[in-house]
Amino acid sequence: MDKCVITGHHFSVENMNHNNNNYDFDNKNNSIGGGGGGGGSSSSRSSSSRSSSNRSSSGSSGGSGSNSSSSINNIINSDNDFKTERKQTKSPPLTLPNIKTTTTTTTTTTTTTTTTTKNENISSSESENSSSRVGSPNCNKKVKKTKTITISPTGYNINSKDDINKFTTYGYTNEKSNARRDPKWINDIIERYNRLKSESLNNNYNGSSSNNNNINNINNNSNNTTSPCQSPSSNTATITSISSPTSSSSSLSSPSFSINNIVNQDVDENDGCDRMNYTLLSQNNNNNNNNNNNNNNNNNNNNNNNNNNNNNNNNNNNNNNNNNNNNNNNNNNNNNNNNNTNTNNNGDECIVKPISLIQNKKSGQRSLKTKEHKEILEALYRVTLYPTSEETKTISQILGMTFGQVKSSFRHRREKLSKSGLFSYAKNLKNCGKSTAPLDNFFENCKYLTTKETEEFAAAYDVSFEQIKNYFKGKRAKLNKLSSKAIQDKDNQDNDNNNSNNNENNDDSYSDEGLF
């Protein structure tokens, strides 16, 4: 059977030679767990829920093996409808899009491995071309032939093996990891995202050049200037634009960085940059100097306007007054800027608050993801596609989404990847294509399985041992829940009946004596 194991964004298809223990559900002569053997007595396991006729056996000279195997065989073959549902055709092989195959050399990405036995001599050219062959000529050795299948989805590039080992799991995987991950990895991704975005903005500032006149024009023409100490709005996910002496324009281009940098970047704790609070120390003095220059320029403009008013006619006086009013407004704006920056004249650090991704969402409302939400969710998808409940709750709190929205987002991502062939669900009893009627019938007679019976059912359904065990465990839990609810309902009904009887007795206790 071909099994698709996905590691990172590369695929490894392994042809595994299973034991010939697959159960033929259409053949009545088959038995699960072994064939007929010699004479002897097989032990019987006593249980309160099992009948002695089905679970005990006596010795004979021509016995047919263990009775547990025959009982399971009888249960499976007893249902005719179950037999018709078993008939299925072989599933077609998995087709993967954008596949690039090479058969000459081996790589460290993904391999398709088959094991064969060679008795003939291996030529020197073949041994040079296939570096994966083990052994020397004229020896019976197991030879491994490799076939490389490389898939490169758009937007993802894995440069080396070190990138794969950055986190516990990397890339799309179809296994639910039982290992408990440290929930700190979610905060690390958010912090790295904030840090990379701030660094990209700082690089854009440092890479441009301008003069003081452009700064004066920007400060004079903008009425709604923001202080570098001002925090961005809680409903937006962008950093507040900061006026810098090296910037030539008030608008900035969007930063460019990939998801690989968010996930794989190594963070140095002692690099002088706080990942959540970004300090701007030299900005305060520059802002104060610029404001002083603006005040001087405005005073000169006022003097020039006054001289022009004396020389012009009466018709131009109104225009000059309007100019003076505009200059006064500019002075007021500059004074407001000075008031905002006076708090930092003592040498205190001006801290810009980090990006806020929290958006207030109501339950049942569709989540409107921003660009930052999508980039962070994409980085989270690549760590795991099966987040735990604690991780889902943490993500919902950071992104301002509800628990159900985050859960459905991961489920939709898995479905989308499975349709494109980049992700495959692990095989279980639900998608194995076989009915669970024999398991249900067996559960009615016996609520617990032995280890041997569990292995036999796992071989018959071609699933893991734990899946059969968990199936019976879930049915027992459901039965206990139903029984406890039934007992509680019965107790409530008894209490209601007792209360009604007490009320009737109280009504009958009133005597009719004295009425006549």
Swiss-Prot record:
Function summary: Putative transcription factor.
Record feature DNA-binding region, as residue ranges: 362-421, 424-483
Subcellular location: Nucleus
UniProt-listed SUPFAM superfamilies: Homeodomain-like
Biased composition (Acidic residues): 505-516
Protein name: Homeobox protein 6
One GO BP: regulation of transcription by RNA polymerase II
UniProt gene name: hbx6
Gene Ontology terms, MF aspect: DNA-binding transcription factor activity, RNA polymerase II-specific; RNA polymerase II cis-regulatory region sequence-specific DNA binding
Region (Disordered): 22-140, 200-256, 268-348, 483-516
Pfam family, one: Homeodomain
Taxonomic superkingdom: Eukaryota
CDD domains per UniProt: homeodomain (cd00086)
SMART domains, per database record: HOX (SM00389)
Bias-annotated ranges (Low complexity): 22-31, 42-59, 66-78, 101-132, 284-346, 495-504
Matches recorded under InterPro entries: Distal-less_Homeobox_TF (IPR050460), HD (IPR001356), Homeodomain-like_sf (IPR009057)
GO CC, alphabetical: nucleus
Keyword list, A-Z: Coiled coil, Developmental protein, DNA-binding, Homeobox, Nucleus, Repeat, Transcription, Transcription regulation
Annotated organism of origin: Dictyostelium discoideum
